[in-house]
Amino acid sequence: MSPVRPPREFEDFLRRTGLVESVEVPLFTPLEGGVSSDIWKVDVADRAICVKRALAKLKVEGDWHAPVERNAFEVAWMQKAASIAPGSAPEILAHDPASGMFAMTYLDPADCKLWKSELRAGRAGPDFASRCGHVLGTIHRETAGDAEVAARFATDQIFHAIRLEPYLEATAACHADVAGRLHELSAITAANRIVLVHGDVSPKNILITADGPVFLDAE
């Protein structure tokens, strides 16, 4: 059986950024990336890395499109979060805004667990949840009212396209009896610009490691 290969752009990105030498033949393994991205584990030389590309059209039944520029803000969130709470996000190894791709450290399942899987298996406790809250609270506290952060993450259109329109406003379109309240909630959320938020804090996006939580897939 032939090995699974990603689109050519992935290998081009790796070589262009120097993560793969010209003579290397990287081994690609597809990873589960939800509906909004293509994600691959790449074995190169003596390490494994992860490469992610945002999709313009999401992998859902409906015709859901989202700006691929969101990829650059995910990178920026990870870098900012890690500068405030070291270890709270994967390390960014390379980023190409034009292609909507970035590379980050690969977190081996042998060394960490997905919080969602642990909860599904009935393994839940307050300690890890408390650590998650502490890290997020620290990020919120350190970015609250920061004009520079607000300017750097002025992503109103992207946030509307991927967080508000497909959820609150799409639900409003199907339920006229609560449409007014949902549109009001959407407007209130869009106008709330106090701290830097992750955008999709969920157990499916949080890894349990020996050093604490690692947050993935910032929106």
Regions found by a protein language model. Name each.
Residues M1-P7, T105, T138-I188:
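Active-site catalytic-loop/activation-segment of kinase and kinase-like phosphoryl-transfer enzymes
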Residues L31, S36, W40-A147:
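ATP-binding pocket architecture of kinase catalytic cores
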Residues E21-E24, R47, S88, D211:
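Residue-level signal for beta-strand positions within conserved beta-sheet cores that form or flank
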Residues T29-A45, I49-V51, E184-E219:
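Active-site acidic catalytic loop and adjacent metal/ATP-binding pocket
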Residues M1-F28:
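Juxta-kinase regulatory segment immediately upstream of eukaryotic protein kinase catalytic domains
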Residues E11, A76-Q79, R181-L182:
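Short, well-ordered amphipathic alpha-helices
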Residues S22, S83-P86, A190, T209:
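Short, structurally constrained coil/turn elements
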Residues L19-P26, E74, I162, G180-A191:
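Short Pro/Gly-enriched beta-strand edge/turn motifs at strand-loop
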